[in-house]
Every structure is written in C-alpha cells, then in structure tokens.
C-alpha cells in the first residue's frame, strides 16, 4: 500500500485507521473520505488530504482514486447493527450498493479493497465455541445479511475479475477515541461514558449475555496486516475470523464499581 482511500474516515474505525495509516505510510497519500455534513476535524483534517466520497456515488469514488493515484481502498462505510435495523433500506443501499460501487471502481482502476465483515454475519445455527472459518451463517438481521452478501460479492470480484479483495470478521470494537455509533456491542463503550458522567446506565443486554470484543488498536493491526499479507498465502480472503476477548455486562459493571462504587 502507498496511496490509500479510507471511505468512512470519520466513523468509529475510520477515524483511528486513517491516522494509523498515515503513521505507517508517511510518504503516501492517505485520503480521508467523508460525506457532506461529516467532514473530518482536528488532526485527521490537518494531517493529510481529504475528499468528499459518498459511497453511493460511484463517480466520487472514481474521482478520488484518480486524483490521488489510489492503489488501496478501505471501505468502512456502513450503518451499524442497531441503526441498520431501524433503517433497513438505507443499510442495504450503503452496505451492498456502496460495496458494488467500490468494487466496480477497483476493477476499472486496479485497486485492492478491504471491507470489514462482522460476527453479525453469523446466525443462531452458527457454532458458538471455536467458530469454524467456514460454517453456516444465516444471520437474521439486515446488518448481518449485508455482511454475508458483502463477503460473497467480494469473493466473486476476486474470482471473476481478479480484484484483490480482503477482509476480517470483526467482533465488537472498543475505543475511547470516537463515540459509539449505533452498534449492538456499543454498550461496552457507552457504559463508561455513563459512569464518568455519574449517570445510571440502562443496558440493552441481559446479564449473562456474553459477546466477543476487541480493542481498537488490535482491530487496526488486523486490518493493516491482512492487506500487507502475501496474497499467495491467503487461504481465505473474505473473511478471516478474528477475536480477542468475551464478557457480559455484569463483568464490566462490577469492574467499574471498583472505581465508581455508586455506579448503577
């Protein structure tokens, strides 16, 4: 990678990934792609190029790729799980239609594409322990359906057109840099904000509901290393399972009470 376009650079992952890439590739163009009304601010805006790139607008993607001689696209545009359920049509338009636009530009311009998948792509029939790489998925949310579709569409573009597509299936991501953005696992970040503000936290999950999580720096490393890997050694491209830790709301709340005894 040398010149990279990050679509969705102001989102939860994109904010930190853009800066990490600029540190990793100081001599390249790491372009922060944003949508109107969500322009980059602070160090993201000050430390490198930016371009308005709405993933539903294929021409904007192509223009940014041409202008900055982009060789790799990180497609991070998506509605997160809880938000997607409230807006299923928009979730499909961004998650699948936007990916199609990105893959078409990549096919025409010779770019590699990273599009994250998720544990949300799994369903009730998926083995919970030591989940196999290749297994039944069958998600029952629009978010998960768009992720499975994205995995298959990316694989198709690799087989059919030779586009270099790669991905990992992220668990819930924990970050203090960007605020939560509507994901089911975002309670694990929201709960700390409530504790600091002295508020009572209303958790959307029942005690005993364990979910896989990952600290953002580990997720960024996975996203970069998969794109740097020798393609000849990749058994799977879309998508590798990655995990880090698992906990339920009680574990977090009990730990918070060690520092904030009155937290509820």
Task: Label each region the model flagged.
Residues 155-210, 216-220, 225:
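NAD(P)-dependent short-chain dehydrogenase/reductase
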Residues 4-24:
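N-terminal Rossmann NAD(P)H-binding glycine-rich loop of SDR-like oxidoreductase domains
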Residues 199, 204-206, 211-264:
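C-terminal substrate-binding subdomain of Rossmann-fold SDR/epimerase-dehydratase oxidoreductases
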Residues 96-102, 146-154:
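Conserved catalytic Lys-bearing alpha helix of Rossmann-like short-chain dehydrogenase/reductases
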Residues 67, 86-113:
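NAD(P)-cofactor binding segment of oxidoreductase domains
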Residues 55-94:
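NAD(P)H-binding glycine-rich loop region in Rossmannoid oxidoreductase-like domains
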């Amino acid at each position: 990678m040398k010149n990279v376009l990050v679509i969705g650079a102001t989102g939860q992952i994109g904010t930190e990934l853009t800066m990490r890439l600029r540190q990793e590739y100081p001599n390249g163009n790491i372009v922060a792609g944003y949508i109107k009304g969500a322009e980059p601010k602070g160090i993201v805006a000050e430390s490198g190029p930016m371009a308005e790139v709405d993933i539903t607008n294929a021409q904007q993607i192509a223009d940014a790729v041409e202008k900055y001689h982009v060789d790799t696209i990180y497609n991070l545009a998506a509605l997160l799980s809880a938000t997607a359920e409230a807006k299923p049509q928009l979730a499909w338009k961004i998650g699948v239609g936007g990916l199609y636009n990105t893959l078409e530009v990549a096919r025409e311009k010779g770019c590699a594409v990273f599009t994250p998948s998720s544990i949300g792509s799994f369903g009730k029939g998926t083995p919970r322990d030591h989940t196999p790489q290749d297994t039944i998925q069958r998600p029952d949310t629009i978010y998960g359906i768009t992720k499975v579709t994205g995995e298959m569409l990316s694989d198709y573009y690799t087989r059919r057109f030779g586009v270099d597509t790669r991905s990992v299936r992220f668990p819930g991501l924990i970050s203090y840099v960007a605020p939560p953005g509507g994901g089911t696992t975002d309670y694990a970040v929201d709960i700390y904000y409530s504790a600091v503000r002295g508020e009572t936290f209303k958790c959307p999950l029942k005690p005993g509901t364990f979910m896989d999580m990952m600290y953002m720096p580990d997720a960024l490393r996975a996203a970069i290393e998969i794109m740097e890997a020798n393609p000849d050694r990749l058994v799977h491209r879309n998508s590798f399972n990655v995990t880090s830790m698992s906990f339920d709301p009680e574990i977090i709340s009990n730990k918070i009470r060690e520092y904030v005894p009155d937290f509820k």
